[in-house]
């Protein structure tokens, strides 16, 4: 180590010492003169100085190893400055003075009371110097200002020990000393001492107070330490004269509930203004010292601020007439005073008075008459503010304003802590508005008195002038707490709560408050606008004084600030809307107001301080005021030069106002537009636009005002055109109330940015301001018109931009979030495969879509269309309650369960992801509009959207419902319930479910029409899974749903064509089949391919069935087919709505590549035939023809109507998820059993019904084989995906499905005779040249019986392993015939497994009708639902086996994707362990009533054995207490006993021991926790729930005190009534306590011959009471007993206590 001054010898070594120690330091040890340098010791041996006197350490040890050393904690407190007379700087508000305390309050109690609010440093109770009597005064010093403020806020005017205490921040205890003097002098008692207002100030004012000169005032201010001496110099006689101050201030303040009420500290800063003799008065009476006008120091802030303000205002507004000047001055003074007095929310009156006083003080020449005029103004709450606003501020005023404004802005920034605090504490009671932020020039309202403030007034003062004032000003405020009860945070919080757009935080500073007060200058009692704006530029206008409050809030010139002013700190503000409502200026008020003094103009009216007004223009309007109302239009200001009264407000700091205005605008917009929340992005955009507009135009144009252009310029944050600059903003709102151009004056009060310069034309002359309301209105109308157009255009532009932005964002959002990119890719791949069919289907679907414009994507369409259409058009749209948010609803990703019918619908709509349900609901109409625009930008693929839109459009109604989840939820809930029932009683439930399903399907059909649209809107519509799910029934109809067709591209194409046709049919059917809730509208389920479709060409051609109306198709098909028919309809190319496609076409239309969904092995036949016909390149059969051809028989059965039913074979919940076209009951087995829609065993057995595992597998593989017409794997994945899946990205699902493809696992069983006559599927056969193709061909949802698939097709399907049999719909039939060949083995196996599964799951369905009809193939939706069940219930062994089989089959297929070769089978844990619902056993609880009704059941005895099951002798509560440690309780009890003993010993005599006092003491705290329960002794007993020590009071025996005679009578009556127990307890010879019918738990105490308690009679307040005391320690759960001590009688009452010493009887 480098030695600083080491000796040469020691420094010589080149190596560095490891350790060193400073041995000698001459600087620290002056005694050692000899060493002139420091001496170091290195490594304990070597020294830096060669001196033998230093002895090295002998044993070198690591100094750190102090094994025995002890660590001691050093307290190193941070030194704090002592706040004595030498302290320089602002004294922190850490001292709280309490007054009117109960004389029992001592230091400890007070400290504990205050400690919760902050760390207490010192507590002192003031005692009388001679008598040492409690004076009710206390001083508490906190370590932080926060604690002090919180204490005042929470304890002021609260009851403590019966006294309403007074708490206030008190710098240096100035107020406390005043109270002390008043009490010690005998003037007041501790409980009557005035804690604020005039009384207190007068007490300390000298007799000469009235004549107090400016000098004396200066002295006062200096005493206050806040009042600048210079300020008083200007003090006018008015200031000096108490009468002038009192009059002006008191009048206004008195009129307004003390603006400076005890809650509002006089100093705006909120520091108690100690200097003012009037402090108490100002605080309590809401009078400032100046208000007091006693010679005693006027409010320092008022005086100095007023003086400065007056001077400035005077000079500025000198141009205006004297009267107007005086008025303006008064107004300004008032504003300033109010600002100072009431921090943020200044009372107009107070502000006016303060301004007047300032004016007077500032101008020594200020005539007394001015003062009187000011008073008059205050009393009248004269409108001069408006006038002032209208008048162009004089140049001087502008200068003054500029000077002031800088501080004002500063003050605008963070409110001074003290002030806010005071405001917070200011109770609402003080009606006077809290002082507005002091004008910048004026200095902090609180600091107004400070010379700095005065100087600032004269010259621009530094930010937070209030602060600039010496701490004294704060001290000056008597009730600092009241001066600013609201801290900035609290005010902001308050504003937020009020949802105001005003910027209270801006005006938070004292200056701001003063400025606000100035702005309030013109405030009139009548509610005329107080020209707060005059005093304040950017500052938010102080709330109008209470007097103004009474008047129409608009009256106040400040944008609500004045109106708010009535409430100090904004706490008292009458209405949260004060910014808006209060801001409305009543024309009458304006008219009545005297000409505003020029001074007020100095400061542009600040927006209402507490709530930052949105652009002041808006602020003037009541929040609730409809933005679109004409009231906004304000008459243009007179062209003449604006009255000098309004000097152009100095431009507020751009950052402040831009920011503020933007915020205001946003807030206002939010408030105006039905409170619809705006997204952060929207807000940001809006603000950006506003800012740009402001920069570019500097006009109102920038405002993204309320949607309605009605706001006009006023709405805009930017200053309106000069005319409107002042008036417009507020005028708009003001007019809202008065319908007149109140704005002119109000505008001046707007923040500076808003009222840039008073434009001569814009400013209204004072006379104008005074015009009667009509005249003003006329003026306003005339004046507003010019700007109205600009405003409207700007707003329109903004709205349009917002719409476009929102549309773009929404589209992007919808595209990204709703239609996932992966899903799109997957979809596209499918589309490519299905293109041949898609094209035809899409064309038809498009036609249908055009005819039936439906929302393509509920959320997206509605949003986009709404935006494009202009929403509600105009800002008004936003103004509507739903608001922007309502209009723009983002898609909900919430998984909604749809009933089968809904699902089918959803599948049709599947592609479009419905936006949030709520959105969908709201958007439905718009969505319908949008439906017409399927290809909307932002929707995923326009094609899909179109298709989807078409289907959705058709189903929009239901979709809307579904979007809400109402339909789906209802159906699904019912289905779920049924499903649960099924779980309990699967077989029974299944049977019931079939009926239920039929009913549900019918109901859902009806609902489906509604829910169709809803389902479309539902997420399922968007999700492919949904498409798949819906594709079954919907894909048939889904073909109609182009979206679905797009979802499974092949499917979608066919489904599109079939969609359109099916849609048409569905539409037609819907009316007819509404009961069935013809799901056809659900076009989304493209996935539902009809196996026929692949063969479509042949089938279509071959099938004689021409496209029948959907109804016809439905009839053609059995009811069940009807459900499916819609899906098949989608399959057939959508025909123009004109002709409903034949059912056959639907199957064809089903997505050519409809994904046959494998039913999850559980609960449903594992083999679910998916009528998913992969769109094979083969041309689709003619849309109409294929369905009929496909289902000649089925069609004949009944063209599937749009009736939505729960998909059979699907659990209700799945059915709800996948609404398939309700199959008509005729469908027979097809109907879902138990609402689950499972196929009957026979159905399952049938090849057609077999799940198209191969198809599923093929679907899964489809992505790989896009080129292949059939996508078994893809279809599988589609099939697998249910509506829930639909929400998930399909690509992922497909991949997962491929890995876990159980569909392919089971080869199609040999086709059993097709349930429906297998429709010839030549095209499908061709299409499904590969097994996968075949599989895809057979859509599960075959509405009509599909012609048996051509053998080759079936063979192909079988080969692919997709087994059309899975497609229980058409494919089932087809497979039943065709798959019987090769698929017979697999099909049979699968069917058997499914059948067995179905048997397990539900009772065997009735013998299936002929295979074709008896067992209609499940709709693709059913298949998907069944397949998707794996996601809900988990993977069971059957699912696993099918997955394995599918995987193996896929590997064996040559057509399989190559990627399969890279995969290997991995066993997956079985997650669906069937745990049948545990049926409640009768013995689990009380027996069930045999009759089912407790009332009709009558009474039946319950044996004790039964009761014991649910009655525990030892209640849980008691058992819980067993583990409780009784030691603590015993300790407490012992302490209490010892305390009693001490008390007794202190009292002494035994006589006293029996005194009531002692007994009462014994009773008061001794309630024990007891409970009653079954007793081993007799019936009920009383048990202890806590340990009870000996000689403790246990309980009082409570009852009715009756005489002996009454007791005898009652006893006889009780016996007659059968009341065997006696609850009569004798107190003495005359009194008996009867607890029989009225008492407490004590009556349950049983008798015991060896009791643990005894009864004692004590007298309390001349009443005898029976108290049970413990005789010995009693444990928890021990029964309380005592000896009844019945008199001996011959008739013995047996004793049941059973103790060893039992006497055997009670008497």
UniProtKB/Swiss-Prot annotation:
Gene giving rise to this polypeptide: SETD1A
Protein name: Histone-lysine N-methyltransferase SETD1A
UniProt comment concerning the protein's domains: The RRM domain confers RNA binding activity.
Span list, region Interaction with ASH2L, RBBP5 and WDR5: 1450-1537
Region (Interaction with WDR82): 60-89
Stretches with biased composition (Basic and acidic residues): 844-854, 993-1002
Localization, UniProt: Nucleus speckle; Chromosome; Cytoplasm
Ranges annotated as biased composition (Basic residues): 1390-1403
């Amino acid at each position: 180590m480098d030695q600083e001054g080491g000796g040469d010898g020691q420094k010589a070594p080149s190596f560095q010492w490891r350790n060193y120690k400073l041995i000698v330091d001459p600087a620290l040890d002056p005694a050692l003169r000899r060493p002139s340098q420091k001496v170091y010791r290195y490594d304990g041996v070597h020294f830096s100085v060669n001196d033998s006197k230093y002895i090295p350490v002998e044993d070198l040890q690591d100094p750190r190893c102090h094994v025995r050393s002890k660590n001691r904690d050093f307290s190193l407190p941070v030194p704090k400055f002592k706040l004595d007379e030498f302290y320089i700087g602002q004294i922190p508000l850490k001292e709280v003075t309490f007054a009117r305390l109960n004389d029992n309050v001592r230091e400890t109690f007070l400290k504990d009371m205050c400690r919760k609010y902050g760390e207490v440093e010192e507590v002192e109770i003031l005692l009388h110097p001679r008598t040492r009597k409690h004076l009710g005064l206390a001083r508490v010093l906190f370590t932080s200002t926060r604690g002090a403020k919180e204490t005042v806020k929470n304890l002021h005017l609260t009851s403590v020990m019966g006294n309403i205490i007074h708490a206030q921040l008190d710098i240096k205890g100035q107020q406390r000393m005043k109270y002390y003097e008043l009490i010690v002098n005998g003037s007041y008692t501790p409980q009557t001492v005035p804690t604020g207002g005039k009384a207190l100030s007068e007490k300390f004012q000298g007799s000469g107070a009235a004549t107090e000169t400016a000098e004396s005032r200066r002295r006062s201010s200096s005493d206050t330490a806040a009042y600048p001496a210079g300020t008083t110099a200007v003090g006018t006689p008015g200031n000096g004269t108490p009468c002038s101050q009192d009059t002006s201030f008191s009048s206004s303040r008195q009129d307004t509930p003390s603006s400076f009420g005890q809650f509002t500290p006089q100093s705006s800063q909120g520091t108690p203004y100690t200097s003012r003799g009037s402090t108490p008065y100002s605080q309590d009476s809401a009078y400032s010292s100046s208000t007091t006008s006693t010679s005693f120091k006027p409010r320092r802030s008022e005086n100095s601020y007023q003086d400065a303000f007056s001077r400035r205002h005077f000079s500025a507004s000198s141009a205006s007439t004297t009267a107007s000047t005086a008025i303006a001055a008064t107004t300004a003074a008032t504003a300033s005073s109010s600002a100072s007095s009431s921090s943020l929310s200044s009372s107009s009156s107070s502000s006016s008075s303060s301004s007047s006083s300032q004016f007077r003080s500032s101008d020594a020449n200020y005539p007394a008459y001015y003062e009187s005029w000011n008073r008059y103004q205050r009393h009248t709450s004269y409108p001069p503010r408006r006038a002032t606003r209208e008048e162009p501020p004089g140049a001087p005023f502008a200068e003054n304003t500029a000077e002031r404004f800088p501080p004002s802005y500063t003050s605008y920034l963070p409110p001074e802590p003290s002030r806010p605090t005071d405001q917070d504490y200011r109770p609402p009671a003080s009606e006077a508005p809290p002082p507005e932020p002091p004008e910048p020039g004026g200095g902090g309202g609180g600091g107004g008195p400070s010379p700095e403030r005065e100087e600032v007034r004269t010259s621009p003062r530094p930010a937070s002038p209030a602060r600039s004032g010496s701490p004294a000003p704060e001290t000056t405020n008597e009730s600092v707490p009241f001066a600013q009860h609201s801290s900035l945070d609290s005010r902001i919080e308050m504003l937020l709560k009020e949802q105001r757009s005003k910027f209270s935080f801006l005006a938070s500073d004292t200056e701001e408050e003063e400025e606000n007060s100035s702005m309030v200058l013109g405030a009139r009692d009548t509610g005329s606008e107080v020209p707060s704006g005059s005093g304040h530029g950017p500052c938010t206008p102080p709330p109008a004084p209470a007097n103004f409050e009474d008047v129409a809030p608009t009256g106040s010139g400040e944008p609500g600030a004045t109106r708010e002013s009535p409430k100090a700190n904004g706490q008292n503000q009458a209405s949260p809307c004060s910014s808006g409502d209060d801001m409305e200026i009543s024309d009458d008020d304006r008219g009545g107001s005297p000409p505003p003094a020029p001074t007020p103009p100095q400061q542009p009216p600040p927006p209402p301080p507490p709530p930052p007004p949105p652009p002041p223009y808006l602020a003037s309007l009541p929040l609730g005021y409809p933005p679109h109302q004409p009231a906004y239009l304000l008459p243009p200001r007179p062209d003449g030069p604006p009255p000098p009264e309004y000097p152009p407000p100095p431009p507020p700091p751009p950052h402040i106002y831009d920011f503020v205005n933007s915020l205001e605008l946003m807030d206002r917009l939010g408030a105006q537009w039905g409170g619809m929340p705006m997204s952060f992005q929207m807000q940001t955009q809006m603000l950006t636009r506003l800012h740009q507009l402001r920069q570019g135009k500097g006009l109102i144009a920038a405002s993204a005002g309320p949607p309605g252009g009605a706001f006009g310029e006023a709405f805009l944050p930017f200053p309106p055109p000069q005319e409107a600059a002042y008036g417009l903003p507020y005028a708009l709102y003001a007019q809202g109330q008065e319908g007149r151009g109140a704005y002119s004056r109000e505008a001046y009060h707007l923040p500076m940015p808003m009222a840039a310069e008073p434009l001569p034309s814009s400013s209204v002359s004072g006379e104008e301001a005074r015009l009667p309301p009509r005249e003003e209105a006329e003026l306003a109308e005339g004046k507003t018109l010019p700007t109205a157009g600009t405003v409207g255009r700007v707003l329109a532009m903004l709205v349009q931009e917002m719409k476009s932005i929102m549309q773009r964002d929404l589209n992007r959002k919808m595209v990204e979030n709703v239609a996932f990119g992966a899903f799109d890719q997957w979809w596209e791949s499918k589309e490519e495969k299905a293109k041949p069919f898609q094209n035809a289907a899409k064309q038809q679907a498009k036609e249908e879509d055009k005819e039936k414009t439906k929302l393509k994507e509920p959320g997206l369409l509605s949003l986009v269309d709404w935006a494009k259409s202009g929403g509600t058009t105009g800002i008004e749209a936003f103004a509507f309650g739903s608001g922007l948010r309502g209009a723009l609803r983002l898609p909900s990703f919430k998984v909604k369960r749809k009933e089968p019918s809904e699902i089918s619908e959803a599948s049709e709509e599947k592609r479009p992801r419905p936006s949030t349900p709520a959105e969908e609901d709201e958007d439905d109409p718009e969505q319908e509009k949008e439906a017409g625009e399927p290809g909307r930008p932002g929707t995923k693929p326009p094609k899909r959207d179109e298709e989807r839109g078409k289907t959705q459009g058709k189903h929009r109604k239901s979709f809307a419902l579904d979007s809400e989840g109402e339909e789906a939820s209802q159906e699904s809930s019912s289905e779920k319930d049924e499903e649960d029932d099924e779980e309990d009683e699967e077989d029974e439930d299944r049977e019931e479910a079939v009926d239920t399903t039929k009913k549900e399907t019918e109901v859902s059909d009806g609902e489906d029409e509604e829910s169709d649209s809803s389902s479309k809107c539902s997420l399922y519509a968007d999700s492919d899974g949904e498409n798949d799910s819906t594709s079954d029934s919907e894909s048939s109809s889904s073909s109609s749903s182009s979206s679905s067709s797009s979802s499974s591209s092949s499917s979608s194409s066919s489904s599109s064509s079939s969609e359109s046709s099916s849609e048409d049919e569905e539409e037609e059917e819907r009316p007819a089949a509404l009961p069935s809730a013809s799901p056809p509208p659900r076009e989304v389920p493209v996935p539902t391919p009809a196996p026929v479709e692949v063969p479509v060409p042949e089938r279509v051609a071959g099938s004689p069935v021409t496209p029948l109306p959907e109804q016809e198709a439905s009839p053609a098909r059995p009811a069940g087919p009807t459900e499916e028919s819609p899906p098949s309809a989608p399959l057939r190319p959508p025909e123009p709505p004109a002709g409903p496609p034949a059912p056959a076409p639907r199957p064809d239309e089903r997505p050519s590549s409809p994904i046959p969904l494998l039913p999850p092995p559980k609960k449903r036949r594992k083999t679910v035939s998916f009528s998913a016909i992969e769109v094979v390149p083969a041309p689709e059969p003619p849309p109409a023809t294929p369905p009929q051809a496909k289902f000649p028989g089925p069609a004949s059965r009944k063209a599937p109507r749009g009736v939505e039913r729960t998909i059979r074979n699907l659990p209700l919940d799945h059915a709800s998820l996948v609404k398939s076209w309700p199959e008509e009951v005729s469908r027979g087995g097809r109907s879902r059993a138990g609402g689950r829609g499972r196929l009957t065993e026979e159905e399952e057995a049938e090849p057609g019904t077999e799940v198209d595992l191969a198809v599923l597998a093929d679907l899964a593989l489809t992505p790989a084989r896009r080129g292949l017409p059939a996508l078994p794997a893809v279809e599988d994945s589609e099939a697998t995906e249910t509506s829930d899946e639909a929400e998930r990205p399909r690509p992922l699902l497909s991949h997962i499905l491929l890995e876990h493809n159980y569909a392919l696992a089971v080869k199609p069983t040999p086709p059993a005779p097709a349930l429906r006559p297998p429709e010839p599927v030549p095209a499908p056969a061709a299409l499904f040249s590969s097994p996968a193709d075949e599989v895809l061909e057979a859509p599960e949802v075959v509405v009509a019986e599909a012609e048996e698939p051509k053998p080759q097709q079936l063979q192909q399907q079988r080969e692919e392993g997709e087994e059309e049999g899975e497609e229980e719909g058409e494919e089932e039939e087809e497979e039943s015939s065709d798959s019987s060949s090769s698929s017979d083995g697999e099909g049979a196996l699968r069917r058997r497994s499914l059948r067995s599964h179905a048997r397990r799951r539900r009772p065997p369905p009735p013998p299936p009708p002929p295979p074709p009809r008896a067992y209609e193939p499940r709709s693709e939706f059913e298949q998907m639902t069944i397949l998707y069940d794996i996601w809900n219930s988990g993977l069971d062994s059957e699912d696993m086996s099918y997955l394995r089989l599918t995987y193996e089959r896929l590997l064996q297929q040559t057509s399989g994707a190559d990627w399969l070769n890279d995969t290997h089978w991995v066993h997956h844990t079985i997650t669906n362990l069937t745990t049948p619902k545990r049926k409640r056993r009768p013995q689990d609880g009380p027996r069930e009533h045999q009759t089912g009704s407790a009332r009709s059941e009558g009474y039946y005895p319950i044996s004790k054995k039964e009761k014991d099951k649910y009655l525990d002798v030892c209640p849980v509560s008691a058992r819980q207490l067993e583990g409780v440690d009784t030691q603590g309780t015993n300790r407490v009890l012992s302490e209490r006993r010892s305390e009693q003993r001490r008390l007794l010993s202190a009292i002494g005599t035994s006589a006293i021991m029996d005194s009531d006092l002692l007994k009462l003491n014994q009773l008061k705290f001794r309630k024990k926790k007891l409970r009653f329960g079954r007793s081993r002794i007799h019936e009920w007993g009383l048990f202890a729930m806590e340990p009870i020590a000996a000689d403790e009071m246990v309980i009082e025996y409570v009852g009715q005190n009756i005489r002996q005679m009454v007791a005898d009578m009652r006893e006889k009556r009780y016996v007659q009534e059968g009341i065997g127990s006696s609850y009569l307890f004798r107190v003495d010879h005359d009194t008996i306590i009867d607890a029989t019918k009225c008492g407490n738990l004590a009556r349950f105490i049983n008798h015991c011959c060896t009791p643990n308690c005894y009864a004692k009679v004590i007298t309390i307040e001349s009443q005898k009471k029976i108290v049970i005391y413990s005789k010995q320690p009693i444990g928890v759960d021990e029964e309380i007993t005592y000896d009844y001590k019945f008199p001996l009688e011959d008739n013995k009452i047996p004793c049941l206590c059973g103790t060893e010493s039992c006497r055997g009887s009670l008497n």
